[in-house]
Swiss-Prot record:
Residues 94-183 are annotated as: Interaction with PAGR1. Keywords: Chromosome, DNA damage, DNA recombination, DNA repair, Nucleus, Phosphoprotein, Repeat, Transcription, Transcription regulation. PROSITE patterns: BRCT (PS50172). Residues 590-1069 are annotated as: Interaction with TP53BP1. Residues 219-230, 428-440, 448-494, 543-552, 565-580 have a biased composition (Low complexity). This is PAX-interacting protein 1. InterPro entries: BRCT_dom, BRCT_dom_sf, DDR_Transcriptional_Reg. The modification Phosphoserine is found at S227, S235. The lineage of its organism: Eukaryota, Metazoa, Chordata, Craniata, Vertebrata. GO terms for cellular component: chromosome; histone methyltransferase complex; MLL3/4 complex; nuclear matrix; nucleoplasm; nucleus. It comes from Homo sapiens.
Amino acid sequence: MSDQAPKVPEEMFREVKYYAVGDIDPQVIQLLKAGKAKEVSYNALASHIISEDGDNPEVGEAREVFDLPVVKPSWVILSVQCGTLLPVNGFSPESCQIFFGITACLSQVSSEDRSALWALVTFYGGDCQLTLNKKCTHLIVPEPKGEKYECALKRASIKIVTPDWVLDCVSEKTKKDEAFYHPRLIIYEEEEEEEEEEEEVENEEQDSQNEGSTDEKSSPASSQEGSPSGDQQFSPKSNTEKSKGELMFDDSSDSSPEKQERNLNWTPAEVPQLAAAKRRLPQGKEPGLINLCANVPPVPGNILPPEVRGNLMAAGQNLQSSERSEMIATWSPAVRTLRNITNNADIQQMNRPSNVAHILQTLSAPTKNLEQQVNHSQQGHTNANAVLFSQVKVTPETHMLQQQQQAQQQQQQHPVLHLQPQQIMQLQQQQQQQISQQPYPQQPPHPFSQQQQQQQQAHPHQFSQQQLQFPQQQLHPPQQLHRPQQQLQPFQQQHALQQQFHQLQQHQLQQQQLAQLQQQHSLLQQQQQQQIQQQQLQRMHQQQQQQQMQSQTAPHLSQTSQALQHQVPPQQPPQQQQQQQPPPSPQQHQLFGHDPAVEIPEEGFLLGCVFAIADYPEQMSDKQLLATWKRIIQAHGGTVDPTFTSRCTHLLCESQVSSAYAQAIRERKRCVTAHWLNTVLKKKKMVPPHRALHFPVAFPPGGKPCSQHIISVTGFVDSDRDDLKLMAYLAGAKYTGYLCRSNTVLICKEPTGLKYEKAKEWRIPCVNAQWLGDILLGNFEALRQIQYSRYTAFSLQDPFAPTQHLVLNLLDAWRVPLKVSAELLMSIRLPPKLKQNEVANVQPSSKRARIEDVPPPTKKLTPELTPFVLFTGFEPVQVQQYIKKLYILGGEVAESAQKCTHLIASKVTRTVKFLTAISVVKHIVTPEWLEECFRCQKFIDEQNYILRDAEAEVLFSFSLEESLKRAHVSPLFKAKYFYITPGICPSLSTMKAIVECAGGKVLSKQPSFRKLMEHKQNSSLSEIILISCENDLHLCREYFARGIDVHNAEFVLTGVLTQTLDYESYKFN
């Protein structure tokens, strides 16, 4: 840093809570404090981890357990210099980055290219400089000449590469072998000096594509094969020339390696061993491709080389807006932990034969109609059932571009696709005849055949349009699929032989797929016949209901546009609907709350609602809560009956398994949950249920269909995250705020983020929220259908919306609006308004007294005599009055429990303040002490005002006076270490505060068995105590297996209250 620290914009780091790991430059800390950043004492509480050492265990814990961004101190310095918080992505200190440990010197490149290379190297963990010195590990130079080049040749420690090395490392996300990128391997053509001949040169270069190579990159492979000049890509002159003739390219026929750089979104997943072949393979002939559009983050300014940038602009017109937003989001400060996000399919492709991997990728995005065949074959033949098959999201804007790319790849990869249009149509007709004539297979059904049927049904249009979409992707650009014949080099001939072998394998695979498709079709036909019969019965029932509804609601049909509509997926054509929908799908019906013709006041939005409550009274330990519900319902115009009767309009219940629920459904009453009631209270309007949590669950209260699952969540915040926690609890699953290898499911809002990356790496299934909602509503098949594409689609408009066929019977009662009589409306309309005015008049007097209004203290005491006081167990208004009196007497409110001398409480409560203060305060007194001090205008002796709570002391079997005496003699947890698992309740920060006030220390890293035994056997080392909870027991499996005690939170909570160590009462068995 410079001697004079830069000026920090006011409150620049106001939202930053940082935790420093290792030695950090004091000036960096000063900059953070000057920008109003807050330092926290535990990494779980931080928003940013700052460290130079990426291999520190605390850094790994912050990344993997707490999902926190880790940045180098340079992030602080550069953010100050730029005047804004920079994205954290490019400042990771971790050693897994591509260019970690590399210091590159840039020479003989244009300023524009230098900026691009500099940004790429530093973004991926390296350093750049313009001076060639001892620190340099690499010299990046486009031509084998110059002083720096000659100097670097004499030093074995410096590796000399062309700029292509940087680009290839980034695009393939791995550090490439520098030996193949030495600039002396470039072969040059004679440069034309006359400007008049530029056009002729361009034509010659274009013609050379037909004779030899289209590879412009200055790689050894291209130079050995007689490619054009290697410095064209980084020469400003040649860039200008080339942009005229070559930027207009056709993706469907361009198989050159430049396409890989132009789009920056394709990179090989499986590469041949021969480096030369690898460098020269045309794009469309790569054995396996992974979409990595989000992997190469854009960097500020004109970072990409001119040619790449120009081609990106040409190709970018066809890119979907969502891909652009993903790339922009990589630099957005709001995206905390976006690293190299891979396509949903990359883990699937790791251990597959190359032909299967390629089929998976090439068919995943545009050819959704083939997903069932491919997925079926993968699950049957490649053990892919342990991972997810997820489609790439395709928007109409990119569909044409991707079709062209896929058509070319399919032309080269699939022999069955390498046919003329007439042959394809004939082949399809034969397939259709074979399928229609195929009898029901005699062999046992494939274990995933049922899955495939449901998958087909879950995607309308998909099965019926296969025969239409299949040829379109071949025939769309037929004239563009055949480029002029290129000259085959020796290694290309070898590759051609390999490709023929791949084609034979693929042909066999496609035959297997056809056989499986026939099997699926026959099973599908049987299911369709059953569905048609069910639909006919359903329609008859619906017609009767419609007639009843029309007779009841005819006067109000003109005003139905004001009513709430429940969103139902768009209707399919009748023929498709019969063949595809898994359950009978009725016509779209409008859902009503109140009669839309009647205006219901907000304060009485439950007018006309008569509630009965089932299930909840048995579940509630606090009966006062039930009384509160009844009071709130009545305050908003509703009534509550003690039992379910025919006059009830709503049944508030948790489960569909009860006699009250069965009766309510028979009588077409509205069955909803307390969560629905909470939602309508917020909206001040009775709306139909529209979330899975609004409907009673399909199993008895306390049923646990997901008892074997440990669920984590990513992408959901605030109320959505709370809803998922509740859904996991109702399903009987364990919920963890962190992600570890023991988690069985990750529920994602979007396929992004560190948790998503880790889940893919650890083979943890990633699903949408609909998966959990379906289980709650009775689709228990979802437990084994976790890999279905319907649960791995993350572009849902509302992921919490219920699946329609699971709630048809529950929505039936909402198709008839609730009527409110005019008399009831008039009798209720006025009183609530009067009450509202009364409340408005009273409200100002009940506001809190502000601290600013407190008069200055009349007495000034020395620090030794000044009481530092905390209050617990009082209403806020009462606390403000006490604080006023305390200030007048010259006392202070303690900043924390550690600095507290007096705790004022009216009874023993297990609040954080009480449990932290009991270990450190001198006195715990009643409010009467403060009142008496104020009356005497001085602080008096506390002995006569010591808190005594006989009821609590009997309940917890302790004496508060004795506990205080023990705490004064010696801290309870002195010389004791605690490891507390992250999902503990109360929170980890609360437990840490309680332990530290009692003299203990909390370990940030989970101790190994060896470390535990070392501390246990060596009396000179501190004891380590393990604290966990039910949801975190999977983290303690090793401890249980080796007979090590693990305690629950009461070991700490009750321990500090009684000031005793009880090693027996709170152990997990």
